[in-house]
């Protein structure tokens, strides 16, 4: 399974979610609160999301960083707003979707192994993906052969070394 990011589709995705939210609010919110809730969603999906996800050769990202620093002086503010930061955010969101997929596969008795370090340019060409698409990870799926790994015994860092209770 190949997990693909499509930051280039942010406008269509925002519009899709906005339309859903308008109907959702009309169906499930008290009539007295509907107008404000719809207005809030229109601000978020109609203006903020397009502003955050738009790309313009780094110029818009630099402006967003300055704006975030200024607003951050007055109130809590998400600071990761540069074009690079937004690309990282898109990839983290996709990785969370991949994680959910892998957990679901395990629940069905299948094993998965997320892969990084592949030739993304060739992979995009092979899959005929558009220029704006990015490959987040490749996840082979199957059933393990007992407890052995591909080349022998499996090795894991001890749990106590990577988990710290606060």
Language model regions located:
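Acidic, surface-exposed loops and disordered segments
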Residues: 1-166
